[in-house]
């Protein structure tokens, strides 16, 4: 799955010249996607040993590479003239508190629905408590929490009324599972893209 997400991101990043945030639900996926993107742009000649090229190119940024504030500053610069375009791959804390208004961020890609981790002791305790109350932990806890987290992640895209962008959620459960409609319903109003061609046209229509 991570390889497919990276391939989709590489296509979009190339078209947009960066301007992309990839949010993952696990650190393992984050590292795999960042590595795949780095290899892709190195092979395409868009990267050098320092992570970018002097003649444009793409710089792949990774959560933990620098402090969060420095990553945000570098990402913002990626949308300005004379600076390499950036794609940032991140997880955890970057689902909220990542504020990049304007054209520097035009695409957010989310690898999977952000359900709470079932092996987390706090999640297990919450699940047990709901079961004792006769409730369904998945419907009454996991789905609402995923909806909230997805809304937070998608909120990285539009920070002011003049912003334009595209959100991609790489999880078929949004359309194949009944709870997918509940999660989509929690997102801000946006036009839905129903094909790859529509997606590419939407990217092409974004302000340069």
Could you tell me what each predicted segment is?
Residues 1-208:
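ASCE RecA-like P-loop NTPase motor cores
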């Amino acid at each position: 799955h991570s390889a497919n997400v990276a391939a989709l991101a590489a296509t979009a990043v190339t078209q947009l010249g960066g301007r992309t945030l990839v949010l993952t639900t696990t650190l393992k996926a984050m590292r795999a996607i960042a590595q795949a993107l780095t290899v892709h742009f190195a092979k395409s000649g868009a990267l050098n040993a320092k992570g970018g090229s002097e003649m444009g190119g793409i710089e792949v940024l990774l959560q933990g590479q620098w402090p969060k504030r420095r990553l945000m500053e570098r990402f913002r610069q990626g949308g300005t003239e004379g600076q390499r375009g950036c794609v940032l791959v991140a997880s955890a804390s970057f689902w909220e508190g990542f504020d990049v208004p304007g054209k520097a961020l035009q695409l957010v890609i989310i690898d999977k629905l952000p359900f709470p981790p079932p092996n987390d002791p706090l999640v297990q305790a919450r699940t047990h408590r709901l079961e004792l109350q006769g409730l369904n932990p998945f419907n009454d806890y996991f789905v609402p929490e995923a909806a909230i987290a997805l809304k937070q992640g998608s909120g990285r895209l539009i920070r002011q009324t003049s912003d334009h962008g595209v959100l991609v959620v790489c999880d078929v459960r949004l359309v194949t599972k009944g709870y997918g409609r509940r999660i989509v319903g929690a997102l801000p109003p946006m036009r839905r893209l129903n094909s790859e061609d529509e997606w590419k046209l939407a990217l092409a229509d974004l302000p340069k």
